[in-house]
Regions:
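Transmembrane alpha-helices and adjacent helix-loop boundaries
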Residues: 2-398
Length: 398
């Protein structure tokens, strides 16, 4: 026994499987680092030979071009620097990504449930939608909706379609009332009322869930929370004499002025990305629902649950563990596909920063590297948030 242990202790390091694995990983890491350093040195040397100076000094220079859409960051032609252009590009990318994710999720879940509907026409319509939208390149869809549908079919600003309450739609975009806060403490009271209302919705929805576990009946907790929010907001308006007013768009001689303009390229891009991504999410939903044991649906039907309650209370909660992982990938694809906005002149990160700013400054290495880092960061943040939610909906086994 002692001889066997002594012989095992004398095994050379090069024959130890663990040490060989570590050595192989270190060798691969060294090769990757060497390749990256070589590429960087060659790039810097080639730029130096051509007299091109690279660095971040250009970020403080004034950008000599106009930006048409920046809802949250103020940009002034001839005054704003390039770093502000970079932030506006990130802002516009995040806007279309968030709007697209919300719309694609709603459409995808709806179509996915319709795909399994016993109604022949609903299920066939869902199948036609999925097979049509997911088999056409997304760039072609973006250009189709913008140049072949919305741009020629929507009227000119003088004949704008109005829906009341200051809503107008024409071939330049969608115009909405703009909220303008009043000075003083009233706007802060209104904001506090809104936040308290959100907290009330969360608290009352959890209370309703606990009541359902105890009694079998679920009170309308979300509705109660919405009523609390509406009451608090109305109270703030009455006490502080309308701390928030809305500036409506007004039709001038040639165009609309005032309010908020959602440019047509943004609307076209959002519509195309939402409908395209929703076709893949619908298949994820269909597969997730199909993965739930048939015995679960039969047990729900035996308890007298309607199809809507069966889906909401039994099937979909179990299907989420299958639906969410591939859906995360579709959210990431939607964010990256937003870079195709340059085809319809929407001013997002690639169009503004990796397009106009790059052509003006010539700092290709720095600008492209920053663009890559932004998309990588957005993808990691999206994945992290959804992975946290995915862990919460996983089945807990004993």
């Amino acid at each position: 026994m002692k001889q066997a242990l002594a012989q095992k202790a004398r095994i050379p390091l090069y024959r130890n499987p663990a040490m060989r694995g570590i050595a192989a990983q270190l060798a691969v890491l060294a090769i990757v680092v060497w390749a990256l350093v070589t590429i960087f040195n060659n790039t810097v040397a080639n730029l130096r030979v051509r007299g091109i100076q690279t660095g971040f000094d250009f970020m403080d220079q004034v950008a000599p071009f106009a930006i048409g859409f920046s809802p949250f960051i103020e940009y002034k032609l001839g005054e704003s620097p390039y770093w502000l252009v970079f932030l506006i590009g990130i802002q516009n990318t995040i806007i279309v990504s968030i709007l697209g994710i919300i719309a694609a999720t709603i459409i995808g879940f709806t179509v996915g449930v319709m795909r399994l509907s016993p109604n022949f026409f609903l299920s066939r319509f869902a199948l036609l939608y999925i097979e049509t939208f997911r088999n056409i390149p997304v760039l072609l869809q973006i250009m189709f909706w913008n140049f072949a549908v919305f741009l020629p079919l929507l009227p000119f600003p003088q004949q704008s379609l109005g829906a009341g309450w200051g809503l107008f739609l024409n071939n330049r975009g969608l115009y909405l009332p703009k909220p303008v806060p009043a000075e003083g403490v009233g706007i802060w009271a209104l904001l506090a009322a809104f936040i308290i209302g959100i907290v009330a919705i969360v608290v009352l929805s959890r209370w309703a869930r606990r009541r359902q576990y105890l009694t079998g009946r679920r009170p309308p907790g979300v509705l109660y929370g919405l009523l609390v929010m509406a009451g608090l907001v109305a109270l703030a308006f009455l006490m502080f004499d309308a701390p928030l007013r809305f500036e409506r768009p007004e039709l001038g001689r040639f165009n609309l002025s005032g309010g908020i303009q959602v440019p047509l390229p943004l609307f076209s891009l959002w519509f195309a990305l939402s409908t395209y991504t929703a076709s893949f999410i619908a298949e994820n939903v269909r597969g997730g629902i199909a993965s739930v044991s048939r015995g679960q649906t039969e047990a729900s039907q035996s308890l007298g649950l309607s199809r809507a309650k069966m889906l909401r209370l039994v099937v979909i909660p179990q299907a989420l563990r299958v639906i969410i992982p591939p859906t995360i990938n579709q959210y990431l694809n939607l964010t990256k596909n937003s870079s195709l906005a340059v085809a319809v002149a929407y001013e997002e990160l690639v169009s503004l920063w990796a397009g106009i700013a790059l052509n003006q400054t010539g700092q290709a290495l720095v600008i492209i590297a920053m663009t890559i880092v932004v998309y990588e960061t957005l993808s990691l943040i999206t994945s992290a948030i959804l992975n946290i939610y995915n862990k919460r909906v996983q089945l807990v086994e004993r």
